[in-house]
Amino acid sequence: MASRGVNKVILVGNLGQDPEVRYMPSGGAVANLTLATSESWRDKQTGEMKEQTEWHRVVMFGKLAEVAGEYLRKGSQVYIEGQLRTRKWTDQSGQERYTTEINVPQIGGVMQMLGGRQGGGAPAGGQQQGGWGQPQQPQQPQGGNQFSGGAQSRPQQSAPAPSNEPPMDFDDDIPF
């Protein structure tokens, strides 16, 4: 069997704004996200730390789009698996335009929320938040934060053991 190629995109990044969810005439949900990924390195000549941020357009469909609209907010960290797609349209002046997006279909696409819940609520996984110095019992993984379109099922990974360190403040690390 001849291989026709592989079109798979995996991103881990932070949302630049709240997802925009719309519904098609058929009733299916579509969510548009803007995802930032950053990489940093040390300049060999100056020794200075450099950083480059890439912005990605992500389009989700179906239940994944609904979940994204309900739970993701600006700054949320998320893992995305999808496919690279370029689409063409004609703008109001009659000029053809192109855009390249990461397409996360309802079947075969994956979206997993990373980090804790934004805006105060209980931490992800339903753990009770204790003091930083108090020992905590490991919780059984509750799931509920990984969503896939259903084409493939992945084994649930166990949550990392709680540490005695204070939670990290990711707001300082977000480039927007």
From Swiss-Prot:
Record keyword Phosphoprotein present: no
Keyword tags: DNA damage, DNA recombination, DNA repair, DNA replication, DNA-binding
GO molecular function: enzyme activator activity; single-stranded DNA binding
Transmembrane segments: none
Keyword Cell membrane tagged: no
An example Gene Ontology biological process: DNA repair
Superkingdom of origin organism: Bacteria
Motif Important for interaction with partner proteins: where in chain: 171-176
Ranges of biased composition (kind: Polar residues): 151-161
Domain SSB: 6-111
Feature: compositional bias, Low complexity: 134-150
Region (Disordered): 111-176
Cellular component terms per the entry's GO annotation: nucleoid
Role summary: Plays an important role in DNA replication, recombination and repair. Binds to ssDNA and to an array of partner proteins to recruit them to their sites of action during DNA metabolism.
Assembly and interaction partners: Homotetramer.
Name listed for the protein in its UniProt record: Single-stranded DNA-binding protein 1
Organism: Salmonella typhimurium (strain LT2 / SGSC1412 / ATCC 700720)
